[in-house]
């Protein structure tokens, strides 16, 4: 009997995974619960519905999200094909007519002879090769199944992420390397603040604008993970006993203890990204740039991933997933989309593309593909499966995830162009070998 793959969820990741499978001659059983059962965020019965913005972000190759889109074009992505066809004027970004976009994908996927669509809710994970791409609003019944499969402690229901900064953009003359009380190796970059600097920062923080919660996010639980601005409003000294505690962090240049200290912790294996410890936040992105830019050393900080707190269902990928998007404990089960800890429309589709290719290779008994880390697709897969297990949070694609160039280039645009060129050369080789 001819083998088929189950794909659960017809969002961006699921639709892309289906497309990659059928392009390789694999039959697909696609399960989508809408419109029989709607989520609080969706409004149509279309596949790959865009529930938030209609922008797929930058299109140029000096931006990592532009590079990942180009890689996907080279691998016959239906999501990018649909976006190009449904594009609307948006300067340097790729924005789409959302109805035309999802209509195009629905039509192509639904009417493909190798696809059988089942309009029903899946509450148990089926046997046999399967891709789970059920997104941030996965139904409670299926979430329970996933929890049992991955382990209770490895499934999360909301993001609470602090901003992540590119190391090259930190003013190293103003910060110092040290661990609290000099315990272990000096692993943190420390941003010292005088009382005057702290007071100005505090005032800006407590008066900054926060992002509005969407209706379906109102139940987000913040216990044990309080936004920094909420903590600050509890009193001017509260942060000094929390994330900005200066005790044990004397400045080696002066030998004195600063009034307040923000610690930055290395976020990736290459040491190119640092996160702001304890600074999970719900501030608007522009406000994050303005307010956090008042901290000494971060005046010109490039934030590659803004702090967020929102409803999201995702697994601890560094613990449970392979870079092929396979579950470590069950090799015929793949995950794709935001559930894996990739963040954003394009990133979700890219993970679906990789999972689809690998599920096809699995069923056809071919070698699975680990995308090179020099590629945008590969750098993202590498990050979500190798980041810190203890503090794993979802991530957008960005150049900070890419391995450094052999020759260091200081000019940012030129460096990004070289990273893009290297990525596209690498993906070309992958495409030729598929």
Swiss-Prot record:
E.C. number(s) listed in UniProt: 2.1.1.74
Reactions catalysed, as given in the entry: uridine(54) in tRNA + (6R)-5,10-methylene-5,6,7,8-tetrahydrofolate + NADH + H(+) = 5-methyluridine(54) in tRNA + (6S)-5,6,7,8-tetrahydrofolate + NAD(+); uridine(54) in tRNA + (6R)-5,10-methylene-5,6,7,8-tetrahydrofolate + NADPH + H(+) = 5-methyluridine(54) in tRNA + (6S)-5,6,7,8-tetrahydrofolate + NADP(+)
InterPro entries in UniProt: FAD/NAD-bd_sf, MnmG-rel, MnmG-rel_CS, MnmG_N, TrmFO
Annotated keywords: Cytoplasm, FAD, Flavoprotein, Methyltransferase, NAD, NADP, Transferase, tRNA processing
Biological processes annotated in GO: tRNA methylation; tRNA wobble uridine modification
Name of a matching Pfam family: GIDA
Disulfide bonds, paired cysteine numbers: none
Subcellular location: Cytoplasm
GO molecular function, one term: tRNA (uracil(54)-C5)-methyltransferase activity, 5,10-methylenetetrahydrofolate-dependent
Recorded GO CC terms: cytosol
PROSITE patterns, sorted: GIDA_2
Names of the cofactor(s): FAD
Alphabetical list of Gene3D superfamilies matching this protein: FAD/NAD(P)-binding domain (3.50.50.60)
Keyword Cytoplasm tagged: yes
Function statement: Catalyzes the folate-dependent formation of 5-methyl-uridine at position 54 (M-5-U54) in all tRNAs.
Family, similarity comment: Belongs to the MnmG family. TrmFO subfamily.
UniProt cross-references to NCBIfam families, sorted A to Z: gid_trmFO, PRK05335.1
Family matches, as HAMAP family: TrmFO (MF_01037)
Protein name in the entry: Methylenetetrahydrofolate--tRNA-(uracil-5-)-methyltransferase TrmFO
Organism: Listeria monocytogenes serovar 1/2a (strain ATCC BAA-679 / EGD-e)
């Amino acid at each position: 009997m001819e083998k088929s793959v189950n794909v659960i969820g017809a969002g961006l990741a699921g639709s892309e995974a289906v497309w990659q499978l059928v392009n390789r001659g694999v039959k697909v059983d696609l399960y989508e619960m809408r419109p029989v059962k709607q989520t609080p965020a969706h409004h149509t019965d279309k596949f790959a519905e865009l529930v938030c913005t209609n922008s797929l972000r930058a299109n140029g190759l000096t931006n990592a999200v532009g590079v990942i889109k180009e890689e996907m074009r080279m691998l016959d992505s239906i999501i990018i094909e649909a976006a190009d066809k449904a594009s609307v004027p948006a300067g340097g970004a790729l924005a789409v007519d959302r109805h035309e976009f999802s209509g195009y994908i629905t039509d192509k996927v639904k009417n493909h002879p190798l696809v059988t669509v089942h309009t029903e809710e899946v509450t148990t994970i089926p046997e046999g090769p399967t891709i789970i791409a059920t997104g941030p609003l996965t139904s409670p019944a299926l979430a329970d199944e996933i929890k049992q499969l991955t382990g209770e402690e490895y499934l999360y229901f909301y993001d609470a992420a602090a901003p992540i900064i590119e190391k090259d953009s930190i003013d190293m003359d103003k910060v110092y390397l040290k661990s609290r009380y000099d315990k272990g190796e000096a692993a943190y970059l420390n941003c010292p603040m005088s009382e005057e600097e702290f007071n100005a920062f505090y005032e800006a923080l407590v008066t900054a604008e926060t992002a509005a919660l969407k209706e379906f996010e109102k139940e987000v639980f913040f216990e044990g993970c309080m936004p920094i601005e909420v903590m600050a409003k509890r009193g001017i000294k509260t942060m000094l006993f929390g994330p900005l505690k200066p005790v044990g962090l004397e400045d080696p240049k002066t030998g004195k203890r600063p009034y307040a200290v923000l610690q930055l912790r290395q976020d990736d294996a290459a040491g190119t990204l640092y996160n702001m410890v304890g600074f999970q936040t719900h501030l608007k992105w522009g406000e994050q740039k303005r307010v956090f830019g008042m901290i000494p050393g971060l005046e010109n900080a490039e934030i590659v991933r803004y702090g967020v707190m929102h409803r999201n269902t995702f697994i601890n990928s560094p613990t449970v997933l392979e870079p092929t998007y396979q579950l470590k404990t069950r090799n015929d089960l793949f995950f794709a989309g935001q559930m894996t800890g990739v963040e954003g429309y394009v990133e979700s589709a890219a993970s679906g593309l990789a999972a689809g290719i690998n599920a096809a290779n699995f069923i056809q008994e071919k070698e699975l593909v680990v995308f090179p880390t020099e590629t945008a697709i590969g750098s993202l897969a590498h990050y979500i499966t190798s980041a810190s297990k203890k503090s794993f949070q979802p991530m957008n694609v960005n150049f900070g995830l890419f391995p450094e160039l052999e020759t260091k280039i200081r000019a940012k645009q030129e460096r990004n162009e070289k990273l893009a060129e290297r990525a596209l050369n690498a993906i070309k080789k992958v495409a030729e070998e598929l």
